[in-house]
């Protein structure tokens, strides 16, 4: 989906105005929502933190409303490991209480927006950093490290779970094919 589709395979949407081309999505078996402003793309000013939150809430709410009308077999909505907050080396599970920092609050609201869906199997995937050499966090870091300019991330003591793009796509495929 794009605000300005450039091919017939792309569907118009504008989450800021809660608009989406329902006709173009009619008859789909699944809707997968992964969009949101990148948490590593810019400095976290008050304005950008608002963009991080609103891009997820407006997008997910717009799509949840579409899912409620279209009734596909499954709706997959991204969330993030930020749900748990800083946990150090403690393993976490889906039943663990969320954290209390900014990203945890974003994830709570993000998942609540996905909960607006009713009557459709809904899966919220709490993903770690998706690593791909040509994009995302790793794509931005590799050039710096190759030139000897890389350094520790954050305070260097935090734990981040990560997944390769290939494995992330396989996980989504598994969700689509299994209950």
What are these regions (language model features)?
Residues 120, 130-140, 174-179:
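Glycine/proline-rich active-site loop of Rossmann-fold NAD(P)-dependent oxidoreductases
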Residues 98-101, 126-135, 155-163:
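Glycine-rich "substrate-gating" loop/helix at the edge of Rossmann-like oxidoreductase active sites
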Residues 79-80, 112-133:
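Conserved beta-loop-beta element that borders a ligand/cofactor-binding pocket
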Residues 61-101:
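Conserved Rossmann-fold NAD(P)-dependent oxidoreductase catalytic core, especially the SDR/UDP-sugar
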Residues 142-150, 158-179:
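Alpha-helical substrate-binding/gating segment
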Residues 7-58:
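NAD(P)H-binding glycine-rich loop region in Rossmannoid oxidoreductase-like domains
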Residues 51-59, 98-105, 109, 163:
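Glycine-rich NAD(P)-binding loop of the Rossmann-fold in SDR/ketoreductase-type enzymes
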């Amino acid at each position: 989906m794009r605000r300005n589709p450039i091919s017939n395979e792309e569907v118009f949407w504008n989450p800021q105005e809660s608009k989406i081309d329902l006709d173009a999505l009619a008859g789909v078996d699944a809707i997968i929502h992964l969009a949101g402003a990148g948490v590593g793309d810019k400095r976290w000013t008050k304005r950008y933190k608002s963009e991080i939150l609103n891009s997820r809430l407006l997008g997910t709410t717009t799509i949840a409303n579409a899912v409620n009308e279209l009734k596909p077999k499954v709706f997959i909505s991204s969330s993030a490991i930020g749900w748990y907050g800083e946990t150090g080396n403690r393993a976490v599970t889906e039943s663990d209480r969320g954290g209390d920092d900014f990203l945890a609050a974003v994830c709570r609201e993000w998942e609540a927006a996905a909960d607006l869906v009713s009557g459709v199997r809904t899966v919220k995937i709490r993903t770690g950093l998706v690593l791909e050499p040509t994009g995302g966090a790793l794509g931005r870091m590799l050039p710096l490290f190759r030139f000897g300019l890389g350094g520790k991330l954050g305070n260097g003591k935090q734990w981040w779970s990560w997944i390769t793009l290939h494995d992330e796509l396989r996980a989504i495929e598994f969700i689509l094919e299994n209950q």
